[in-house]
Amino acid sequence: MDISVKQMYNIEENGHAMGFLKKFMMENAGAAAARLLDERLEGAPRVLAFAGMGNNGGDALVAARHLAGRGADVTVVLLGNPDGIRTEEARWNWSILEKMPSIKLVSGGSFDASVSPDAIIDGILGTGITGEIREPYLSAIKFINGIQCTKMAIDAPSGLDPQTGEAADPCVKVDFTVTFHRMKEGIPKRKDLTGDVTVQKIGIPPEAEKGVL
C-alpha cells in the first residue's frame, strides 16, 4: 500500500508518542541505508555523503557512521553550518560524528569538487522539498549528477517530490533509492530518477498506523 507524505508524517508522530522515538527511527533508517549500500560495494570504498539540514540529512549521518564501522573511507558534507541543523535527532547524530576522527567532516556548504568517491549518498532533501532548489543544494545536486559512481538516495532523490512525482530542475538521479516504512505515492512515477527502489521497515509499530490508514 502506497501512502502520502502526510500519512507518513502522522505515522511517525504516532510512533513517537508511543515511545518509539524519532531518534530510533533515524537510527534504523540510516543503518538500513548503510547496509544496502555496503552490499553493492567491494573492499574499503570511498563514500561521500551529502547531508541536508533536516532529518533526511540525519539519516545520512547515521548511514555514514555505520559505513565507517564497516571499513569504508567516509566523508560527510553538511550543506550548512552545524548550528543550523533543524532537528534534535540530526543534531545528536552530528555530535557523534564530531567525536569520530575516522570520518572526514566538511560543513558550511562548500566541498571539494575534485574528489572521486566510489559511492555517493544523497541525504539532502528527502521528503522535505519546497520551492526552487537554492545554493548550496544546487551545486551539490549538479555535482552528484556529474560524477560517475554508485549513487543512493535516502527516502527520495533530492528534487523529487515524493508526493506528486514532480521533479525540480535539477533533480538528483541515482542508481537506487531506499525509502522507509511504506512506499510514498509519487516515488514509483519517476523510476528514471530513483533507479531501483527498496522499502525498508524501521521498527515503527503497526499500531502507529491506527487512525491514519
Swiss-Prot record:
Family: Belongs to the NnrE/AIBP family.
Organism: Cenarchaeum symbiosum (strain A)
Entry's cofactor comment: Binds 1 potassium ion per subunit.
Name by which UniProt lists this protein: NAD(P)H-hydrate epimerase
Gene behind this protein: nnrE
Domain (YjeF N-terminal): residue spans on this chain: 8-210
Keyword NAD recorded: yes
InterPro entries to which the protein is assigned, alphabetical: YjeF_N_dom, YjeF_N_dom_sf
Pfam families: YjeF_N
Superkingdom of source: Archaea
